Regions:
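An exposed, glycine/acidic-rich loop-and-rim segment of catalytic or binding clefts
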Residues: 1-167
């Protein structure tokens, strides 16, 4: 793509224990920029195991299906009646091994969800709860979608105290 990009990301911990991530980018030519992060959270803490018991709610009644290679098809599909439906809180692992074609293509959840009634203002779009710790994480965005990735392709990695992390 044309141009040079200077990007900055600032991570802040607020007084009320919120993680605030702000992105800023400038270019010297018109170009495409898609800033993101790949932070992964297990709200039950170090060595707690899988996130499959975590409960997830998304403000999204539609998602964007993918083809082989996880490339979006351009379709916007309703989640109702599918394992992609998190419009009511449910455990991440409840349907993750379902034979639904979208889960089979990606080995689990790795999809963009379309935010309901998006208007560009900062809105609460997701809540995740860790059952063992009781910790709750809420996500807010001004953007029209959110990618939910359940770590399907994270290779097992050694961690602190001999604990392994990954799928």
């Amino acid at each position: 793509f044309p141009g040079n990009v200077t990007a900055n990301v600032t991570y802040s911990l607020t007084a009320d224990n919120a993680i605030d991530i702000k992105y800023d980018a400038t270019t010297d030519k018109t170009t495409v920029i898609n800033l993101t992060n790949h932070s992964y959270f297990n709200l039950d803490g170090h060595g707690a195991g899988s996130i499959e018991e975590h409960e997830l709610w998304l403000r999204a009644s539609h998602f964007t299906p993918v083809a082989a290679g996880s490339i979006p098809t351009g379709e916007i599909r309703a989640v109702a009646g599918t394992p992609m439906d998190f419009t009511q809180p449910k455990k991440i692992g409840r349907d993750i091994r379902d034979d639904y074609e979208q889960l089979l293509l990606t080995g689990g959840y790795d999809h963009n969800f379309v935010i309901d009634d998006w208007d560009g203002t900062l809105r609460h779009i997701a809540t995740v709860k860790g059952p063992k710790s009781g910790r709750v994480m809420k996500a807010y965005t001004t953007l029209p979608g959110v990618q939910f990735y359940a770590g399907n392709f994270i290779d097992v990695q050694p961690g602190k105290d001999g604990v392994t992390y990954g799928n």
